[in-house]
Amino acid sequence: MENRFEISMLIDYYGTLLTEKQFNVMTLYYNEDLSLAEIAEINKTSRQAIYDLIKRCSKQLHSYDEKLKLSKKVDKRYRIKEELMAELNKNSNLDENIKKYIDEKLEEIINA
């Protein structure tokens, strides 16, 4: 299977665009680390059906990301945040509480 972390992130971004069953299976497989057999048993279906569903959903999530580019936008925001924080840390005159406050607010912007 593909990079588990990458798919897990795509589930976080686009999971609401999947059906309830697709979302549940993808979450069980990528976030809860259940095996195909365990998921098949829970869903009362075959291991092959779960495997096919996971492959289909992975392609679907990648397709959403190619079109909407949320992961690239978030990555870019984190890079900008790190650059800003590096510049702030160069200035030793700033109070640590102010730096922490700015860091928290930048995090809110990224996650908005």
UniProtKB/Swiss-Prot annotation:
InterPro entries: RNA_pol_sigma_r3/r4-like (IPR013324), UPF0122 (IPR007394), UPF0122_fam_protein (IPR054831), WH-like_DNA-bd_sf (IPR036388). Belongs to the UPF0122 family. Might take part in the signal recognition particle (SRP) pathway. This is inferred from the conservation of its genetic proximity to ftsY/ffh. May be a regulatory protein. This is UPF0122 protein CPE1714. It comes from Clostridium perfringens (strain 13 / Type A).
